[in-house]
Amino acid sequence: MPPKDPDSSRTPESRSKSNRPRAIRRLVIWYRRNAAVTSLVDTATSSASAAGTVAGTVANSMLQPLVFDPLRWLQGNTDDEEIQEADRLWVAVDGMGGDHAPGPILEGCLEAIERLPLKIRFVGETDKVLEAADALGLSERLAQAQAADHLDLVASGPSIGMDDEATAVRRKRDASINLAMDLVKKGQALAVYSAGNSGAMMASAIFRLGRLKGIDRPAIGALFPTKDPGQPVLVLDVGANMDCKPAYLHQFALLGNIYSRDVLQVEQPRIGLLNIGEEDCKGNDLALKTHALLRDERRLHFAGNCEGRDVLSGAFDVVVCDGFTGNVLLKFLESVGSVLLGVLRAELPRGRRGKVGSAFLRSNLRRIKKRLDHAEHGGALLLGVNGVAVIGHGSSKALSVVSALRIAHSAASHGVMEDLAALQSGCD
């Protein structure tokens, strides 16, 4: 018998259904191969229409983050073209601070001056900096940055190691972290960044810049992502003070309130106290006494206790806690992005449908990782000293350095120190 025409016994509706998987596969292949940004939207729309109802549904729910959002990002990613020389601010960088310094630190600085309105005073041991630049193929970019007066190399003496005691800042007076602090103190830089020994960073900031009047202990404040991409939450302290008094947490709240208002542009920051329950009567002695102080503070909008599950909910703009608890919270969050992606990869089907689904989800997974990746929030502010100081993770790579320098620039350009000085005068 002659073979039957496969389409002769099918209704138009059944033929349309059988073509849908093929149309979806074609759509996936197209998206992978097509790099023409100018025709992305038109092509995506026509492909979705050709794929029928199923692909249309997929397009509505999936192509928004996969096509339209990346298109907007590509069209808006022109920071380097908009930089005006008059807008550039000097930032001092401890070039020898970090597990892998000075190479990744230098690379991040060179990236930052191309993306952000910054000038860098890079403090480090000159021979090691030039060797690292040569090893990473950065020598030409470094020379160009120096010629354009965007980067200035400042020679330093032996650096302070990651395992050194904080008191080493007194012995090694010409260490890179000390000289970087001096640049801020002398007004030759508006902010300082270091990914080195955090204890030495704090000690140098206190000795060289000094504490703000009325602030007993500086605090490290880190920005945590929330379910709203445009609304991070500031958590402090995340590691500077292991044992705290209620008065310290009260001061942390005042510092965080100013930063959230000035830099994050939150009109009336909601202050939360990290605790084990929402009720006023919950918590240990530290939490109970701090709660009373924050409740009676008229300069703050105290929103009550914040449970651990509410830190990333968007219900609070500033959350205060002791440094021990905050550091545990910070380190836990650093692991969330990679663990979440690993679970999703393991759970996705491995057959044909799984491959198609994975192709559609790939961009979403990357965006999730980006929002949760601690490298995207590569710096924490040291609040309470008389200058803008940003602390980076010891293992910081170039991306983390750029992120930290963005934080430094934002703090320096939004008048944070002026308002902190006003807070200081209020303590007279």
Curated annotation (Swiss-Prot):
Q: What is the lineage of its organism?
A: Bacteria, Bacillati, Cyanobacteriota, Cyanophyceae, Synechococcales
Q: Tell me the route in metabolism or biology where this protein functions.
A: Lipid metabolism; phospholipid metabolism
What name is this protein filed under? Phosphate acyltransferase
Protein family per UniProt: Belongs to the PlsX family.
Q: Name one Pfam family in it.
A: FA_synthesis
Functional description taken from the UniProt entry: Catalyzes the reversible formation of acyl-phosphate (acyl-PO(4)) from acyl-[acyl-carrier-protein] (acyl-ACP). This enzyme utilizes acyl-ACP as fatty acyl donor, but not acyl-CoA.
The protein's location, in the record's own words, is: Cytoplasm
Listed under GO biological process in this entry are: fatty acid biosynthetic process; phospholipid biosynthetic process
NCBIfam families per record: plsX, PRK13845.1
The alphabetized UniProt keywords are: Cytoplasm, Lipid biosynthesis, Lipid metabolism, Phospholipid biosynthesis, Phospholipid metabolism, Transferase
Where would you say this protein principally sits, based on its record? cytoplasm
Per the record, GO CC terms? cytoplasm
> What EC number(s) has UniProt assigned to this enzyme?
2.3.1.274
What GO molecular function annotation could you give as one example from this UniProt entry?
phosphate:acyl-[acyl carrier protein] acyltransferase activity
Q: How does it assemble?
A: Homodimer. Probably interacts with PlsY.
As its record notes, the protein acts as a catalyst of: a fatty acyl-[ACP] + phosphate = an acyl phosphate + holo-[ACP]
For this protein, the record's InterPro entries field holds:
FA_synthesis, Phospholipid_synth_PlsX-like
Q: Where is the composition biased (Basic and acidic residues)?
A: 1-16
Q: Where is this region: Disordered?
A: 1-20
